[in-house]
Amino acid sequence: DQGAGVTYLEPSASQIGHKESIKDTARVLGRMYDGIEYRGFGQDVVEELAKYAGVPVFNGLTNEFHPTQMLADALTMREHSGKPLSQTAFAYVGDARYNMANSLLVLGAKLGMDVRIGAPKTLWPSEHIVARARAVAKETGGRILLTENAEEAVKGVDFIHTDVWVSMGEPKEAWQERIDLLKDYRVTPELMAASGNPQVKFMHCLPAFHNRETKVGEWIYETFGLNGVEVT
């Protein structure tokens, strides 16, 4: 809507990484466009594009990180908390191994925020990402807490974040395992109340499985008896 010329290259219309190397693709697209946004799977792909394109490359989403979502989330938290970000606390509860939890951890550390991760220890962010975030937080005054206790994670926060428990491409069999692991980390009215903050707000990058109004939501209800998964 800003008048830029945009070309969308979907996977079936591109040979990136298949018949043409990432390096060659980056060099060609960098001569044709003023910027490139990559939305895909591998973090290594977007980093290689950035290395060889010669123009700005934006990470629209990878398995590891979701920085463009963080720009929107930081703005949303700033608008709706009424406080500077450095005085804002938020929690992420659920499966914390992937892009949303990783990115929220890094975002909070960089902006000097109070960041809580509530998840089973087996589903925490990787040690090297946590170590990087803690190092940054030391410089910015950020606070980082990782806990297996969901109520401890949300105590006193301004925002509670979550994401889907099973990602695109994972088999249906993964649902039972995640439900067993994460049933105590669903965002419910009770968990919201456990924050002790009557103004606490809920955030989700979407799509969310919160009712039966989708094919997946209905299948989850019929299979597991849950009306809503990560949030009710």
UniProtKB/Swiss-Prot annotation:
Keyword field contains Transferase: yes
Q: What is the first-listed, main subcellular location in coarse terms?
A: cytoplasm
Print the keywords alphabetically.
Amino-acid biosynthesis, Arginine biosynthesis, Cytoplasm, Transferase
Q: Which residues bind L-ornithine?
A: 99, 163, 167-168
According to UniProt, this protein's pathway is: Amino-acid biosynthesis; L-arginine biosynthesis; L-arginine from L-ornithine and carbamoyl phosphate: step 1/3
EC numbers for this chain: 2.1.3.3
Q: Which GO terms describe its biological process?
A: arginine biosynthetic process via ornithine; citrulline biosynthetic process; L-arginine biosynthetic process
Gene Ontology MF, one: amino acid binding
The residues listed in the UniProt record as binding carbamoyl phosphate, with positions renumbered to this chain, are 15, 39, 66-69, 204-207, 232
Subcellular localization, per the record?
Answer: Cytoplasm
Output the Pfam families linked to this UniProt entry: OTCace, OTCace_N
Reading the lineage from the top rank, the first entry is Bacteria
Keyword Cell inner membrane attributed: no
InterPro entries registered for this protein in UniProt: Asp/Orn_carbamoyltranf_P-bd (IPR006132), Asp/Orn_carbamoylTrfase (IPR006130), Asp/Orn_carbamoylTrfase_sf (IPR036901), Asp_carbamoyltransf_Asp/Orn-bd (IPR006131), Orn/put_carbamltrans (IPR002292)
Q: Which family does it belong to?
A: Belongs to the aspartate/ornithine carbamoyltransferase superfamily. OTCase family.
| Its biological purpose | Reversibly catalyzes the transfer of the carbamoyl group from carbamoyl phosphate (CP) to the N(epsilon) atom of ornithine (ORN) to produce L-citrulline.
Q: What is this protein called?
A: Ornithine carbamoyltransferase
